[in-house]
């Protein structure tokens, strides 16, 4: 029996980031969460749309990522928009810091998932696209789709 593809276990994805940015490199980082935050993340109640990461004092912080309040959290609930620390190796942090010093480069979260019981976030070093670049991408995607469609019908 053929092996099946491993399913994508993403709890949240930032699809808009791949449209708005050219992703140059990606890193897998752990994320420091409180008890009610991890319960909300496991329930897929997280929004990465406006999120970004910054390097401050040798640490990487994830900002503007909304993790909804946990329903049974009562007084122990967390602040939905608090800054969260990303867990990376020093070498990776140094590289991220050097890259973000360049003009037009930022760090964006691409995906949040659970791996071996721990929450992980896939972050990408990204460079902003211009409007004409976005149109080129859409045009190229449509052409490839049209080619696949004709090959399927006549091939």
Swiss-Prot record:
Q: Tell me yes or no: is RNA-binding among this UniProt entry's keywords.
A: yes
S-S bonds: none
* Major place of residence: cytoplasm
Query: What processes in GO biological process is this protein linked to?
Result: trans-translation
Keywords, alphabetical: Cytoplasm, RNA-binding
GO CC entries: cytosol
Question: Has the keyword Iron been applied to this entry?
Answer: no
Q: Which InterPro entries match?
A: SmpB, SsrA-bd_prot, SsrA-bd_prot_CS
User: Which GO MF terms does the UniProt record name?
Assistant: RNA binding
Q: Where in the cell is it found?
A: Cytoplasm
Q: Which domain of life is it from?
A: Bacteria
Taken from the record, one Pfam family name reads SmpB
Looking up NCBIfam families in the UniProt record yields: PRK05422.1, smpB
PANTHER family (UniProt xref): SSRA-BINDING PROTEIN, TMRNA-BINDING COMPONENT OF TRANS-TRANSLATION TAGGING COMPLEX
Q: Which family does it belong to?
A: Belongs to the SmpB family.
What HAMAP family does this protein's entry cite?
A: SmpB
What is the stated purpose of this protein?
Answer: Required for rescue of stalled ribosomes mediated by trans-translation. Binds to transfer-messenger RNA (tmRNA), required for stable association of tmRNA with ribosomes. tmRNA and SmpB together mimic tRNA shape, replacing the anticodon stem-loop with SmpB. tmRNA is encoded by the ssrA gene; the 2 termini fold to resemble tRNA(Ala) and it encodes a 'tag peptide', a short internal open reading frame. During trans-translation Ala-aminoacylated tmRNA acts like a tRNA, entering the A-site of stalled ribosomes, displacing the stalled mRNA.
Its protein name is SsrA-binding protein
* Source species: Ligilactobacillus salivarius (strain UCC118) (Lactobacillus salivarius)
Q: What is the lineage of its organism?
A: Bacteria, Bacillati, Bacillota, Bacilli, Lactobacillales
